[in-house]
Amino acid sequence: MLTYETWEENDVSFSEEDETKGALSVLSWAYKEYENEIVYACSFGVEGMVLLHLINQVNPSAKVVFLDTNVHFQETYELIQKVRERFPSLNIIEKQPKLTLNEQAKLHGDKLWESNPNLCCKIRKILPLEESLANEKAWISGLRREQSETRKHTKFINQDHRFQSIKVCPLIHWTWKEVWRYVYKHSLPYNPLHDVGYPSIGCEKCTLPVGEGGDSRDGRWAGKVKTECGLHYQ
């Protein structure tokens, strides 16, 4: 088994020539390699809808974790229910932070997402994902190279130093148009905020619509020197 510790033995390669640009092959390999020791960390963005559909074909009982920060858009919570109905056999886990919003405010002040967004992300996303990955050998992410400068070198299989794990990214070669084409072709549910200028949807407090010509991460933590929550630093 390929693990963080045995990374030097990595000789895995995949063809990008099929209709999913290698995504199904990558997922098939991942679930064969890690069996029940892999989880998909899903934010329920539009890429997530594609991956959930593909994962359901490969492993209908796969584990899916959603990092419920308690400050997501209502539309996101409604979408999760639709996904549960569409893919009832998937094991969707809504992971909560240890601190409630009130407890966080008492310790760090109100509106931590404004005063210290990095700490807020650590408490409400990074630490919960660390806990979710503690007993896993690998995790799946919907990163695409086209999304931003910070993601353009992502590979199918990555040694993830942040979580000391293997990060599997099946959609790296997909374009934004291809993602939507797949969603429409398979009549997949998606967050209606995508239709009103939100290409990337995170917490309600830190996500704004993106103007024409911006990249998909421009609406995240707008006005701050920050485009990632910290989950995807290598």
From Swiss-Prot:
<dbReference type="InterPro" id="IPR014729">
    <property type="entry name" value="Rossmann-like_a/b/a_fold"/>
</dbReference>
<keyword id="KW-0411">Iron-sulfur</keyword>
<comment type="function">
    <text>Catalyzes the formation of sulfite from adenosine 5'-phosphosulfate (APS) using thioredoxin as an electron donor.</text>
</comment>
<feature type="binding site">
    <location>
        <position position="120"/>
    </location>
    <ligand>
        <name>[4Fe-4S] cluster</name>
    </ligand>
</feature>
<dbReference type="GO" id="GO:0004604">
    <property type="term" value="F:phosphoadenylyl-sulfate reductase (thioredoxin) activity"/>
</dbReference>
<feature type="binding site">
    <location>
        <position position="121"/>
    </location>
    <ligand>
        <name>[4Fe-4S] cluster</name>
    </ligand>
</feature>
<dbReference type="GO" id="GO:0070814">
    <property type="term" value="P:hydrogen sulfide biosynthetic process"/>
</dbReference>
<dbReference type="GO" id="GO:0043866">
    <property type="term" value="F:adenylyl-sulfate reductase (thioredoxin) activity"/>
</dbReference>
<comment type="pathway">
    <text>Sulfur metabolism; hydrogen sulfide biosynthesis; sulfite from sulfate.</text>
</comment>
<protein>
    <recommendedName>
        <fullName>Adenosine 5'-phosphosulfate reductase</fullName>
        <ecNumber>1.8.4.10</ecNumber>
    </recommendedName>
</protein>
<dbReference type="InterPro" id="IPR002500">
    <property type="entry name" value="PAPS_reduct_dom"/>
</dbReference>
<keyword id="KW-0963">Cytoplasm</keyword>
<dbReference type="GO" id="GO:0019344">
    <property type="term" value="P:cysteine biosynthetic process"/>
</dbReference>
<dbReference type="GO" id="GO:0046872">
    <property type="term" value="F:metal ion binding"/>
</dbReference>
<keyword id="KW-0479">Metal-binding</keyword>
<feature type="active site" description="Nucleophile; cysteine thiosulfonate intermediate">
    <location>
        <position position="229"/>
    </location>
</feature>
<dbReference type="InterPro" id="IPR011798">
    <property type="entry name" value="APS_reductase"/>
</dbReference>
<dbReference type="Pfam" id="PF01507">
    <property type="entry name" value="PAPS_reduct"/>
</dbReference>
<keyword id="KW-0408">Iron</keyword>
<feature type="binding site">
    <location>
        <position position="206"/>
    </location>
    <ligand>
        <name>[4Fe-4S] cluster</name>
    </ligand>
</feature>
<comment type="similarity">
    <text>Belongs to the PAPS reductase family. CysH subfamily.</text>
</comment>
<dbReference type="GO" id="GO:0019379">
    <property type="term" value="P:sulfate assimilation, phosphoadenylyl sulfate reduction by phosphoadenylyl-sulfate reductase (thioredoxin)"/>
</dbReference>
<keyword id="KW-0560">Oxidoreductase</keyword>
<dbReference type="InterPro" id="IPR004511">
    <property type="entry name" value="PAPS/APS_Rdtase"/>
</dbReference>
<feature type="binding site">
    <location>
        <position position="203"/>
    </location>
    <ligand>
        <name>[4Fe-4S] cluster</name>
    </ligand>
</feature>
<dbReference type="GO" id="GO:0005737">
    <property type="term" value="C:cytoplasm"/>
</dbReference>
<dbReference type="GO" id="GO:0051539">
    <property type="term" value="F:4 iron, 4 sulfur cluster binding"/>
</dbReference>
